[in-house]
Amino acid sequence: MRYIGKWMMLGALVSSSVFADVKVNIHRDVAPLVVNGEKVGFFISKKSVLDFDNGLNQLVVRVEKLIDNNQGEKEKFNSKPVIITFKASDRELDLFVDSVISRSKDAEEFELNPFFILKDKNGDPIQIMKQEILPNGGGITRDYETEVYRYNKKNNIIIASEKLSQSIAEQPIVEMEKGVEMVQYWYEKASNEDKKQFASLAFENRKSEIAKQNTKSQELDMLVYWFNQTSENGRKNIINWIMNN
């Protein structure tokens, strides 16, 4: 399985003759997490395109965007992940949300019933076999691949083809280090002040470890701890991720 999209535009363009049967254009506010049972790479772009074989396919997606909180500050909103099982052949589709999500109130309302629209270029909806919130498997961090496997087993869903072809740029799949994943986790829980302090510390110490900080913030302490447990390349990935969030 190969992922497609404008990952970081580091790969060479592939031949224009390499196309799949169904193309799905992902809206900039929608982030794919799992495609046909396999987790999407760490640096997938907001403006992604996925190519599928004809037939039954599956996506796990969520909304990822900056919104205004109740204090008038910008904060990152990651919605609950939704698993979409759909059937299509020889069509170009658009995946998006039919909701305006710009404030905390909008996000709260969307979370009550997160729903995504999948239409073709004529605006006609395509056959969605099933769409619902992906059940959480428990644990500190989400294991989306395992959750999808259990979901499909419970619902007797079999995806015949898990092959994706690349239509824009081909990139090596980036495996996320444990430290990078944990920094992501604690960063989402941190206050805006802690995020700013950690971002400054991470940038200053991108080639070394961050000295122990005397703070009363568990989130900041854990961010520093996991940053120090990560390789130099992983730290670069963390900094790049912070700059884009």
UniProtKB/Swiss-Prot annotation:
Signal peptide: 1-20
InterPro entries linked to this entry: UPF0319
Domain of life: Bacteria
Keyword Signal part of the UniProt annotation: yes
Keywords tagged on the record: Signal
Family: Belongs to the UPF0319 family.
HAMAP family per UniProt: UPF0319
Protein name: UPF0319 protein VV0984
Species assigned in the record: Vibrio vulnificus (strain YJ016)
